[in-house]
Every structure is written in structure tokens, then in C-alpha cells.
């Protein structure tokens, strides 16, 4: 195997969107073109029992939302494609943000009736901060939506990124006729037996259709006043190519995939803690854990650490260093994924995502290296929780299952665990309420451990250096706790309690995280 040639073929990207913009549906269609699924049907088939391939967890199937990031792989047109389907729900932004550290590009799915929504904006900011290319898919043209020119204007005004339309819709909703493909200079037809037609046939096909006349006017305007196409600007994350289509009816998706693979970047390097970039073509293997997922197979209570390979080649059975612990590990049981189905893998290269079976060795953010290399990659973002719950086992006889469940779900980063410094009582912290619901559901369905959860409300979290700590600083308005790394932390009732503490202990420095 020519490793350099293999690395060049890799395209690794995440799909981001606001909930219900159609992200999981487009993922299904891409897998369909990659030959990974035979039936790319409607995603939210709650009554029919057909569920999205990427929404593999029980609660996702029940609720029709993605709450974990799925990893899927397929081959298309000489490229090896790695898709990371991320949760659209805002409570799971932590998982999504970490996933965005493991990709080289992002596909942003926008509901053409709603435009840029809150969660899309948040996720786009992370992508922009990383400087990776963004490709936009304006979805749901089979329904009535907003004017295409308005959608482009919104992209530029709200997200601050220049746009270039690769195609243009001819009507929408019931009047949707197809797409004027600017890049391939052809028409893509929504109705009838023929899929494509030449631009010359446009007038004959559509006659004096007012929508087609509008398209010609819009394109003339774009040619005069629109942005210029620039591959350099796309790769720098300064220009987003925009595709219109309908994921539900699988229209415009294949054209999008083919053009996307032409312009999406090869695997890029990753920054170490000293600021130096590790090149994907370095011969030595390196990678980092961006996600840990327990119970992908509930029958086996397994845990998988997802690793983005940054450089070199993985070979089954190889030994790696874990600089965080100073110990080594052997990578003998490694898989690649199509949502919940998986296959053992013997080789993988930079750009690939592999799943390493984990018995408690790894943590999110861990670096894996080989030989004399003991460097670490830049830390992944962590988030300070905003709302808290006290948690305990409902049945004292189930303490073992309760502790195992908490330990595994906390290591995934699904929720954060704190212990009351004085009483040892467990407290969970989360970014949003849905995280608690998912935690409770998974504890009961995957670990057979019913839990009692009591709300503590919102808290302002600050860390304190162990040498500055005096337990008498704690009060009912600022609970003293330990985080899961046993570091002391205060949970303040509100900002007033925090200011009161700062006035009382002016020499004590409190630390705030992201």
C-alpha cells in the first residue's frame, strides 16, 4: 500500500445544522450513494419502525433527534469518505465541538424555509475559528421556502462568510422544477424520466415558465454583482460554495457529493502543545481521542474510544504511547464504523477515524504516539456546565450498576460529575436539560440502574487552587465540590454570591473554564 496515495484519497468532514434542518436525512443519502445502505428512506419513521442508520441509540430512535456523533465511512469516486454526523440539539454542543476538532471540512445543512438558525450560527463560529472549509446545502426545496437571494444575503450578513452558488433552484415547493447547475453548466430536472438536460434546452423545456425567467434574471445579477469563485478562498474558509436541493427526495445530493469531493481538502496536520504542526505524511503514527462512547453494542457493555489518525499508518497489533499516563497500550482490537455496524480493521491512515476498544485506559483528548515520540496534541475544548442535579441510586442493591454507569457516561463527556467535598454526594453538571434526560434514560436502559435526580438549578462554576483552599470558605451559597479529576471547585448560587466571595477573599484567584 502506498501510504501517501492513500492519505491523499481521504476526505473527513462533519455535518452541522440546527435541529430538523435535515442533517440526518442528507447523511442517509450520502451513505446510499456510497453503497452502504440499500434504502435511504424518510428518517423519522417512528410509526413504520424505519430509523436513520446514523441515529443508532435507542433514545435517538424514539425521539427522532441525534444526541451523539455517529461516525460512518464509505468509498465513492476513488475517495475514502469519513462522515461525522453530529448532534444538532444545542444541549449536545460539547460532543459536537469536540467532533469538529477531528475533521478537515464541514457541511452546513440549512432549512431553506427558515434560513440561518441559532444552533447553526453557534456551530459555524467553531468551524470559522478553526479555519476549515464550509460547504452549504440549502435543503427542503420540495417545500416552499425563502427566496434564494435572501438566503445568500443572510449567510453573508449573519455568518460573515462570502458565498458562491454552485446551482440555482427553478421554483420551489409544489412548483419546484429542478436546478440550474452553474458549475456543470446543465439543468438538473426534478420531474420526468430524464435527470439532466443542456442549458440550450431550457427555453424549450420550460417555455415561458415565470420561475425559469426569474432564474435567468437572478443568474445575470449574480454574474454581475456576486462573488468570484475561488478554490483558495474555499480552502481558507473564506468562501462557502452553496448547493440547493432536497435531501428527502434525494434531489441535488449526488451532484453536491461529486463537487464536494472535488474541492474538499485532504487530511491536514494538527497542532501540538508546543505549537508545532504534525504533518499527516509523517511516517510515525499519531492520533487523538475525540470521543468515547459506551454501549454501542448493549449486549457486550463495550466502550469505544474514537481516534482521529493525524499522521502515518495504523497497523493492527501496534504498540502506542499514552503521554498523559506515561504508559503504553496495544491496539489489537480496532474497528471502523457504519453507525452501529462495524468491522475489524487491520490498516488505516491519516485522516481516518478508528474505534479502539477501551477498558478504561483512555480519556477524551488523549494523544497516541509511537516510538520515542511523547508529545501531546493541543487540548480539546471543555465546557463549564450551567445546570446541576443531585443524583443517587434508587435501589441501594444496584450500587454496582449505578457506579459503573456513572463512570462510563461521565468518561464519554455526556455529563460532568462533581462530588460534594464534605458529604461525597454525587452532582451532575450539564449544558442543557436534555443531557439529564438522556443520562437518566441510558442509566436505566443500558445499566439497569434507576436513578433519583433532584434539580439544583443554575450554578456559576469556578475552580480554586488546592493550596488556596480552606473548607470554611464553603457556605449554602457556594457549595464546595471536587470535579472528576479531584480538583476543588465552587458552585456559586449566582453572580452575587461570586462577587461576595471575591470581596471576602480578595487574594484568592478563581479560575473560569470555557
Swiss-Prot record:
Gene Ontology terms describing biological process: regulation of translational termination
Residues annotated to bind GTP: 17-24, 85-89, 139-142
GO molecular function, one term: GTPase activity
Keywords carried by this UniProt record: Cytoplasm, GTP-binding, Nucleotide-binding, Protein biosynthesis
Residue span, tr-type G domain: 8-268
Localization per record: Cytoplasm
Keyword Protein biosynthesis: yes
Pfam short name (any one): EF-G_D2
GO-annotated cellular components: cytosol
Family, per entry: Belongs to the TRAFAC class translation factor GTPase superfamily. Classic translation factor GTPase family. PrfC subfamily.
Protein function: Increases the formation of ribosomal termination complexes and stimulates activities of RF-1 and RF-2. It binds guanine nucleotides and has strong preference for UGA stop codons. It may interact directly with the ribosome. The stimulation of RF-1 and RF-2 is significantly reduced by GTP and GDP, but not by GMP.
Protein name, entry field: Peptide chain release factor 3
